[in-house]
């Protein structure tokens, strides 16, 4: 993979994490029964976004402008029906699947110097998919998110 292609993929992934951080924070309001899940997911997105931000700095790549982050987040929020939890889960699952594969590929083909951050990116996306699968099956997925954070010795406020 050429460096230009690699850094563009990093930039896009970072953009997604910024959107996810805000989106999940707002979804805690839309789905009050799942507020803790979404607040914790927002922390995960922030953690991953910060790790990718470090890579963007290393490669001297400018992140996507905040206005685009806010614009996409608002657009995504407008499409969410707060009374359709299961519908949202199924839609989100379909959105996640290609990213799981993309981040697996990025981890496999990325520079060895970036493997810590790329593993975090890959593993968090897999965790999100597992969370969604548990919720679709009628199980509580919060423990999966919490275990993920604990595996990185996260000590922030929850």
Identify the role of each PLM range.
Residues 1-158:
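Non-heme di-metal
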